[in-house]
Amino acid sequence: MPGRRIIAIWFPYMGTERILRKTQHSLGKPVVVVAKKSQSEIISSISAAAQYKGLFVGQSLRDASAICPNLFVQTQNSYAETQFLKGICRWSSKFSPWVATEGNNGLIMDITGCSHLFGGEDKMITHILLAYDELGLTTKIGCADTVGAAWALSRYSETVSYTHLTLPTTEAV
């Protein structure tokens, strides 16, 4: 009997892409979302353009503004971000009935028994990537036998958008 198959979906720019969808702002201009931490404003989400300029999550807005003076800055709205992710989670149930939010910028999806409906695991993942792309969301997907492995692949794999891992069975070990 085949084991469970889990997909972890990470939206690395979710905070800024939510803003970009709402404001119809130019994709080429660096965008950051900032949160108040103590006496300073810290970047909580960046756009791909901001990352290209050398900005990173956790950086102070003061430092980021010195590096990139033409930043488009928005204040973080945690409630709106949470509701946005919950909406994506509900929408994603068209791929699998077992979808849950993971943190503030990811989903976990159990695709055991579902992938054949899309023509196999690889085709299902391609379908998911294209669907999120149509929504204007950047995604990295990891697929593995366990939640932890899928999560790690989605965040730390060197591939651009999709990584895949099948753990050896006990018979193979």
Stretches with model-predicted labels:
Residues T163-T169:
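Conserved small/polar residues in nucleotide/adenosyl-binding loops
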